[in-house]
Amino acid sequence: MRAVIQRVSEASVTVDGRVIGAIGRGLLILLGVGVGDTEAEAKLLAEKSANLRIFADDEGRFNRSLLDIGGEALVVSQFTLYADTRRGRRPSFSDAAPPEIAAPLVEAFANELQRLGIAVGAGQFGAMMQVALVNDGPVTILLDSAIFREPRNRHER
């Protein structure tokens, strides 16, 4: 599972000319589900997203999390995070989970954020969406659940 996390002062998602999700200060989370991803990974990434200290404290240091600031999250599914561009000019998306697997995992991710006490807005799975945001910083972080399976220290490999 992959998440592109952007710190925002506001963000919204529109489908068919209608805003279906909007947040103020918080995180826009573009979430891709890969083949083999599980609900455990959805919960792990949600917890990591909620607790990442990427908001400034009173001294301007990254010491506060989304939970600490009482921020919101806008979760938008994005299978294109699994684009394979190694061959040719047209990306392959064969590493992305099929919709019947991905949709419940995106929902599990959003539900876990809500369980942690975060107000969550969401896109519409499978729809053509327009996403608007005001980047704050900018701060953009990439999370990949595959990395959490690897040893943290190079010497542990």
From Swiss-Prot:
It is an enzyme of class 3 (hydrolase). Gene3D superfamilies: D-tyrosyl-tRNA(Tyr) deacylase. Its EC number is 3.1.1.96. It catalyses: glycyl-tRNA(Ala) + H2O = tRNA(Ala) + glycine + H(+); a D-aminoacyl-tRNA + H2O = a tRNA + a D-alpha-amino acid + H(+). InterPro entries: Daa-tRNA_deacyls_DTD, DTD-like_sf. One of its GO terms (biological process) is D-amino acid catabolic process. GO terms for cellular component: cytoplasm. GO terms for molecular function: D-tyrosyl-tRNA(Tyr) deacylase activity; Gly-tRNA(Ala) deacylase activity; Ser(Gly)-tRNA(Ala) hydrolase activity; tRNA binding. A motif (Gly-cisPro motif, important for rejection of L-amino acids) lies at residues 137-138. Pfam families: Tyr_Deacylase. Keywords: Cytoplasm, Hydrolase, RNA-binding, tRNA-binding. An aminoacyl-tRNA editing enzyme that deacylates mischarged D-aminoacyl-tRNAs. Also deacylates mischarged glycyl-tRNA(Ala), protecting cells against glycine mischarging by AlaRS. Acts via tRNA-based rather than protein-based catalysis; rejects L-amino acids rather than detecting D-amino acids in the active site. By recycling D-aminoacyl-tRNA to D-amino acids and free tRNA molecules, this enzyme counteracts the toxicity associated with the formation of D-aminoacyl-tRNA entities in vivo and helps enforce protein L-homochirality. NCBIfam families: D-aminoacyl-tRNA deacylase (TIGR00256). A Gly-cisPro motif from one monomer fits into the active site of the other monomer to allow specific chiral rejection of L-amino acids. Belongs to the DTD family. This is D-aminoacyl-tRNA deacylase. The lineage of its organism: Bacteria, Bacillati, Chloroflexota, Chloroflexia, Chloroflexales. The gene is dtd.
